[in-house]
Every structure is written in C-alpha cells, then in structure tokens.
Amino acid sequence: MRLVFAGTPEFARLALEALLAAGHEIPLVLTQPDRPAGRGLKLTPSPVKEAALAAGIEVAQPRSLRLDGRYPDEALAAQARLVAVAPEVMVVAAYGLILPRWTLALPARGCLNIHASLLPRWRGAAPIQRAIEAGDARTGVTIMQMDDGLDTGDMLLERTVPIGAETTAAVLHDELARVGAEAIVAALADLPALAPRKQPEQGVTYAAKLDKAEAALKLDESAELLARRIRAFNPVPGASLRLPGLNEPVKVWQAEALPESSPAAPGTVLRASAQGVDIATGQGVLRLLELQKAGGKRQSAEVFVRGWQPA
C-alpha cells in the first residue's frame, strides 16, 4: 500500500520500520524539525527522520501544516508534496503537529493514528504516564481513524498490554511502541474487512501534557500515589524531592509504598538504611530505593546513604 508516514520520536520509529519491513511503499515521511539536544545543544534529527533517511525516503519537516498559520509557505510546500505523492493512507504516530482538515481529507482511505491507550481512556498527550500514575492495571494501543477531535475518531483495532506493579514509563513506552508497530501492520493488512467502531461515550479521560512542575513530589499525598508518580515520570521529567542536609532536590527513580503508617509529619525521614530511605507521607510511608543527587549518578539507596547524613 502507498503510504505517507507522519511521526517524530522513538515510539514512531518502530512503526515506520515495521511498515517498511511489511513491504509498504512510503515515498514521503513527515517529521518535526531538528531540535537542539545534548550539552552542546547541537541540532539533532528526530528518530523518525534518521530511520527515513537510512531507508532513502524523502523527508519533509514543516513547522506547521496550517495554511492560515504562522508558516503558510511551509504548509503549502508540504501540501504540494502530499498531493503529488497521492497516498492511500497516512499513518500518524506521535507526530506532534495538529493535522488540519485538508490533511485529513487528502489520503484516499484517510489518516490512521497509533494511539498509546485503550480509547476513550487517556485521550491526549501523555497516555503512558497518566495510565501508570492513575494505577491502571492495563493499557494498550488503539488504531483509529483520525477526525477533527482530540483522539475522538472511530476505532479499527485494539491491543491490550498489562501494567505491572513495577512498570516504569520507559518500560511501558517500549512495549507499547512494539505492540503499536505490530498493530498498524495488522490493521493495514485487514483494512478492507475492519469495521470502524464509535468510541464509547462513557469512560472518557484526558491525559494532560506533562508539566515539569509536577516532577516535584508533594509529600502530603499518599505513598501509593507518590510511588506510582515516580514510575510514571521515569525517565521524563524525573520525580524529585528535597532531603535534609542537601541543598538541591534529589531525583527519585525507584520507590515503593510500605504497608505501614506513621504519625510523623509528611517529609520526615523515618529511617535511612541499605534497604532504603523511608519518608512519612500524607498517607503511609514511602521507601526510596534509587536516587540521584544533583550532578551525580543514579545510586541504590545502599550507596546513597553512605554519603548522606540527615541533618
């Protein structure tokens, strides 16, 4: 099938490579412009761009696809290329740009999106993190037909993935990327036979974009919620808190809620040992298992406590 692929991060790269391996013709890839990255802030191509160029595919990187937006010349150029390519389907995976109506209407069979949740739960920008944060036991991937709304299109195919008690966003991301790549290949293979299904009106939730301010843990919340949030924010933006005796916040990469309570004020360090740093919270006790001082490396609690003494 003749496709155009629109995507940007690692999640999308796996889908692009799977589509190529399945024999689909992809003459054009859309991805976001190169961004500064690393300590030197060197302009760096997206994972999708790297994969496309390695496969000899033309890449377009408009800053917007809105013909009436801030970059109309770039949008017009992209429109001209899409019209010339005349795709049967556009596959979209974490592209990062809004697709205006002209884009949605251009492919003969429409635009299919790989969304990292079981819709209608967790529509929006951060479905992986919000599913972990909420304590969901499962999530998955939905292949849907795109429309004007925010992840509101008809569903073609779903794949379910369990969320384990220790699953981080990094681990879940990689699993959903793999499942999503398999799902889009399967959906395209069965496209004529797949019956679009309306999303249920019940159970709609929105996965708000991550805010860096959320990374600072509020210890008056429950230990269970804090432990989930630490997993949800691993690796980005990375949860943090302040510990006595240290001037800078400490990143927390792994923690668990202990089956005990404490009358101490939230934030009180109860114990610091090789087993972990135990902190009183608004409800329960949070044990920190893996930490990172500002400018330092990740350390197990056992190593961390050797070089730290609570004031």
From Swiss-Prot:
Q: Which InterPro entries match?
A: Fmt (IPR005794), Formyl_trans_C (IPR005793), Formyl_trans_C_sf (IPR037022), Formyl_transf_N (IPR002376), Formyl_transf_N_sf (IPR036477), Formyl_transferase-like_C_sf (IPR011034), GART_AS (IPR001555), Met-tRNA-FMT_C (IPR044135)
Q: What is its EC number?
A: 2.1.2.9
Give the keywords, sorted.
Protein biosynthesis, Transferase
- The lineage's top-level taxon is Bacteria
Broad class of enzyme this protein falls into: transferase
Q: Which organism is it from?
A: Bordetella avium (strain 197N)
**Catalyses which reaction(s):** L-methionyl-tRNA(fMet) + (6R)-10-formyltetrahydrofolate = N-formyl-L-methionyl-tRNA(fMet) + (6S)-5,6,7,8-tetrahydrofolate + H(+)
Q: Which GO terms describe its molecular function?
A: methionyl-tRNA formyltransferase activity
Entry keyword annotation includes Methyltransferase: no
GO CC term, one of those recorded: cytosol
Q: What is this protein called?
A: Methionyl-tRNA formyltransferase
Per the record, the similarity remark reads:
Belongs to the Fmt family.
Q: What does this protein do?
A: Attaches a formyl group to the free amino group of methionyl-tRNA(fMet). The formyl group appears to play a dual role in the initiator identity of N-formylmethionyl-tRNA by promoting its recognition by IF2 and preventing the misappropriation of this tRNA by the elongation apparatus.
By its UniProt entry, which Pfam families does this protein fall under?
Formyl_trans_C (PF02911), Formyl_trans_N (PF00551)
What is this organism's lineage? Bacteria, Pseudomonadati, Pseudomonadota, Betaproteobacteria, Burkholderiales
The record lists (6S)-5,6,7,8-tetrahydrofolate as bound by 117-120
